[in-house]
């Protein structure tokens, strides 16, 4: 059992903090927390505060509880709550938090179990935390790193998942946007980063859905049908039999008449 060196929060303060959280007054709850820096929350209260802060997208409270209570005491946080926290952090531009949530989940061994349902749930949580980490990196480095670096992070986190789960463009809007930014730069190295990833790179791609996802992102940003045909032709020269579900959706949504 973990030893707690800080005194537990008093009953009166605990009640006020719980009431503020349940009533949706997260700024008030955060103020109480900051006034009680030397006091420790019990695990039940901690999860309640985190859950309410997440439901209300109050990222300041999430970050404060994370850095001042969860990490110092190495407390376990339920996997689905971690996923929701990561989503809030992504959209509120606390872009270093998702990677920390993933590391915490992996270090604590959360969600591991022997039953099939426990295993499926653990895989779903792992997928979501990795996905948000990829998206946070793409969003935070949109204009400061090359597309190839974002793609490398994607492969490290998503391409290596056991079972090769489907990877769909709709789940990676920030990465798709990064492909568009690279295209707008019209720099040779960036254009190469988009097209040379189709088979002319040292990185090993394992999941059959990874390269089609990149293809779909490129197709979403090409200027017109002529360029789309060229990209598709180049892709087909390198690969056969890969799922082109997303590519077909993108082509249809863009109004291109191309046989995939």
UniProtKB/Swiss-Prot annotation:
Disulfides per UniProt: none
Pfam family, one: PET122
Span of chain positions assigned to the transit peptide in the UniProt entry: 1-8
A single cellular component GO annotation: mitochondrial inner membrane
UniProt subcellular location: Mitochondrion inner membrane
Signal sequence, start to end: none
A single GO BP: positive regulation of mitochondrial translation
GO molecular function: translation initiation factor activity
Membrane protein topology class: Peripheral membrane protein
Keywords: Activator, Membrane, Mitochondrion, Mitochondrion inner membrane, Transit peptide, Translation regulation
Protein name per the record: Protein PET122, mitochondrial
Species name: Saccharomyces bayanus (Yeast)
């Amino acid at each position: 059992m973990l030893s707690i060196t800080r005194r537990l929060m008093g009953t009166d303060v605990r009640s006020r903090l719980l009431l503020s959280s349940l009533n949706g007054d997260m700024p008030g709850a955060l103020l109480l927390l900051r006034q009680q820096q030397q006091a420790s929350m019990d695990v039940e209260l901690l999860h309640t505060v985190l859950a309410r802060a997440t439901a209300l997208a109050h990222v300041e409270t999430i970050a404060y509880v994370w850095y001042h209570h969860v990490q110092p005491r190495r407390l376990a946080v339920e996997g689905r709550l971690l996923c929701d926290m990561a989503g809030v952090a992504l959209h509120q531009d606390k872009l270093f938090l998702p990677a920390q949530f993933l590391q915490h989940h992996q270090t604590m061994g959360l969600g591991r179990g022997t039953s099939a349902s426990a295993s499926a749930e653990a895989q779903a949580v792992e997928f979501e935390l990795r996905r948000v980490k990829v998206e946070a990196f793409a969003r935070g480095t949109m204009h400061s790193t090359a597309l190839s670096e974002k793609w490398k992070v994607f492969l490290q986190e998503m391409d290596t998942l056991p079972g090769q789960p489907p990877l769909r463009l709709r789940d990676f809007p920030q990465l798709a946007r990064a492909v568009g930014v690279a295209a707008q730069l019209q720099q040779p190295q960036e254009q190469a980063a988009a097209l040379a990833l189709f088979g002319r790179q040292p990185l090993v791609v394992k999941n059959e859905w990874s390269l089609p996802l990149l293809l779909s992102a490129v197709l979403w940003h090409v200027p017109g049908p002529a360029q789309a045909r060229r990209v598709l032709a180049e892709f087909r020269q390198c690969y056969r039999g890969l799922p082109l579900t997303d590519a077909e959706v993108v082509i249809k949504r863009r109004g291109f008449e191309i046989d995939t």
